[in-house]
């Protein structure tokens, strides 16, 4: 098997909003692999990440979903739709035995009811506590038992009718008047997933690509957890085709000789660049101690260094370019990415105005 260049996987700090909305970069990939990997990861992320969702509900005195509810502004179908939008973080242990959890709710409080009014259940935590549920009129009340299970993707209420039948008597409820109503279940915690790719060295005969994956979740799992779970699902499928357990990564990926050579030649102290104290310290903390290492940094790698604000990045770019001109250094890179990404940096250095 011909070896391919080692790839790197990292989070793009310049485009990170929070742990639930961020971008990952995979590079360098052989030509065509960015599209191939990106497509399968995106489809898996949107369809196959495990979460929990309601699938059935029993509301006091409600026989069918089109029924009006006395003392409530909402009818049954609107109430169910509102409850369906509640998102949960869960403990795996409570679903190990029967893949079933129940939440009981009862109130006669007048006014608007939100997810935050639902009592806490061991092993379950509501993420979107501001989710609106219903508006109770004076003298009215609301009582329901909500049933949840683990799953993947989207299951409509018709299919959940069969799920209710399968659970049978295990769906225990103290509510005497009313029927079990099936609900649509949206298990997927990934709200958005976008992929993009670009060529790294279009002027070279050996064209390589960079894959960017932007993920936004519903806050029940982090974007990093979601992409890791997607990768495990994909690998599990390919294990059937090839003996992956016995495949050593060293057999597939070649050593990065270029990086090794650069490390050997890295002898000029970073102080020779004449950077500000703040810029130099940030580079040293990131383990860049020589001029050669700084010159070898791509624009994207530079923008991802922790504690580098806008002014520090500009300082490094200027000093780096001056040094390159002096020694005739040419790496074929441009500073376009840095110029664009500086506007995206929200965390400028302390004390820099």
Curated annotation (Swiss-Prot):
UniProt keyword annotations, A-Z: DNA-directed RNA polymerase, Nucleotidyltransferase, Transcription, Transferase
Reactions catalysed, as given in the entry: RNA(n) + a ribonucleoside 5'-triphosphate = RNA(n+1) + diphosphate
Protein's UniProt keywords contain Transcription: yes
Molecular function in Gene Ontology: DNA binding; DNA-directed RNA polymerase activity; protein dimerization activity
Region listing for Alpha N-terminal domain (alpha-NTD), in residue ranges: 1-245
UniProt KW Transcription keyword: yes
InterPro entries tied to this protein: DNA-dir_RNA_pol_insert, DNA-dir_RNA_pol_RpoA/D/Rpb3, DNA-dir_RpoA, RBP11-like, RNAP_asu_C, RNApol_insert_sf
CDD domains referenced in this protein's UniProt entry, alphabetically: RNAP_alpha_NTD
Region (Alpha C-terminal domain (alpha-CTD)): 261-353
Family named by the database record: Belongs to the RNA polymerase alpha chain family.
Domain-related comment: The N-terminal domain is essential for RNAP assembly and basal transcription, whereas the C-terminal domain is involved in interaction with transcriptional regulators and with upstream promoter elements.
Oligomer and partners: Homodimer. The RNAP catalytic core consists of 2 alpha, 1 beta, 1 beta' and 1 omega subunit. When a sigma factor is associated with the core the holoenzyme is formed, which can initiate transcription.
Protein name: DNA-directed RNA polymerase subunit alpha
């Amino acid at each position: 098997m011909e070896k391919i260049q080692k790839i790197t996987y990292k989070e793009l700090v310049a485009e990170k909003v929070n742990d639930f909305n961020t971008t990952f970069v995979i590079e360098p990939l052989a030509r065509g692999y960015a599209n191939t990997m990106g497509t399968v990861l995106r489809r898996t992320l949107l369809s196959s990440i495990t979460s929990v969702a309601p699938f059935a509900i029993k509301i006091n005195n409600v026989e069918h979903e089109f029924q009006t509810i006395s003392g409530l502004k909402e009818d049954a179908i609107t109430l169910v739709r509102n409850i369906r939008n509640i998102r949960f973080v869960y403990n795996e242990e409570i679903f190990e035995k029967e893949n079933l959890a129940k939440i009981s709710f009862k109130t006669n409080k007048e006014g608007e009811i939100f997810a935050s009014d639902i009592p806490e259940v061991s092993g379950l935590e509501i993420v979107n506590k501001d989710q609106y549920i219903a508006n109770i009129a004076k003298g009215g009340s609301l009582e329901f038992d909500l049933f949840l299970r683990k799953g993947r993707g989207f299951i409509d209420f018709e299919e959940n009718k069969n799920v209710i039948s399968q659970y049978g008597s295990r769906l225990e409820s103290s509510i005497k008047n009313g029927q079990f109503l099936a609900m649509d279940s949206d298990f997927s915690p990934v709200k958005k997933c976008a992929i993009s790719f670009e060529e790294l060295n279009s002027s070279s005969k050996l064209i390589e690509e960079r894959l960017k994956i932007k993920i936004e979740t519903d806050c029940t799992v982090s974007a990093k957890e979601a992409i890791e779970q997607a990768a495990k699902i994909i690998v599990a499928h390919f294990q059937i085709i090839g003996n992956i357990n016995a495949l050593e990564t060293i057999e597939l990926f070649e050593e990065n000789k270029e990086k090794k050579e650069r490390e050997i030649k890295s002898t000029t102290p970073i102080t020779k660049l004449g950077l500000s104290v703040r810029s130099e310290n940030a580079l040293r903390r990131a383990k860049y101690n020589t001029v050669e290492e700084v010159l070898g940094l791509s624009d994207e790698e530079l923008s991802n260094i922790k504690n580098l604000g806008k002014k520090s990045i500009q300082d490094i770019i200027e000093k780096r370019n001056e040094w390159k001109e002096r020694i005739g250094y040419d790496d074929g890179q441009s500073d376009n990415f840095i110029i664009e990404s500086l506007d995206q940096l929200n965390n400028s250095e302390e004390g820099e105005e």
